[in-house]
Amino acid sequence: MDPNCSCPTGGSCTCAGSCTCKACRCTSCKKSCCSCCPAGCAKCAQGCICKGASDKCSCCA
């Protein structure tokens, strides 16, 4: 269980617009945390909760 996430892996949780957890992969939201991509990246909002602005992020590879 992620110490910064309110649920165990596979559990149920509410994913907010801002992300404080390191590995939130709860079944209720099916999203993980990642850095926000630049505005031109269409993949940024797919499958992740933004936890901060960054020019480099895993969901925009």
Swiss-Prot record:
One of its GO terms (cellular component) is cytoplasm. A divalent metal cation 1 binds at residues 5, 7, 21, 24. GO terms for molecular function: metal ion binding; zinc ion binding. A divalent metal cation 4 binds at residues 33-34, 44, 48. The keyword Signal does not apply. GO terms for biological process: cellular response to cadmium ion; cellular response to copper ion; cellular response to zinc ion; detoxification of copper ion; intracellular zinc ion homeostasis; negative regulation of growth. A divalent metal cation 6 binds at residues 37, 41, 44, 60. Residues 1-29 are annotated as: Beta. A divalent metal cation 2 binds at residues 7, 13, 15, 26. InterPro entries: Metalthion_dom_sf, Metalthion_dom_sf_vert, Metalthion_vert, Metalthion_vert_metal_BS. The modification N-acetylmethionine is found at residue 1. Residues 30-61 are annotated as: Alpha. A divalent metal cation 3 binds at residues 15, 19, 24, 29. SUPFAM superfamilies: Metallothionein. The keyword Acetylation applies. A divalent metal cation 5 binds at residues 34, 36-37, 50. A divalent metal cation 7 binds at residues 50, 57, 59-60. Monomer. Metallothioneins have a high content of cysteine residues that bind various heavy metals; these proteins are transcriptionally regulated by both heavy metals and glucocorticoids. Class I metallothioneins contain 2 metal-binding domains: four divalent ions are chelated within cluster A of the alpha domain and are coordinated via cysteinyl thiolate bridges to 11 cysteine ligands. Cluster B, the corresponding region within the beta domain, can ligate three divalent ions to 9 cysteines. Belongs to the metallothionein superfamily. Type 1 family. This is Metallothionein-1F. The gene is MT1F.
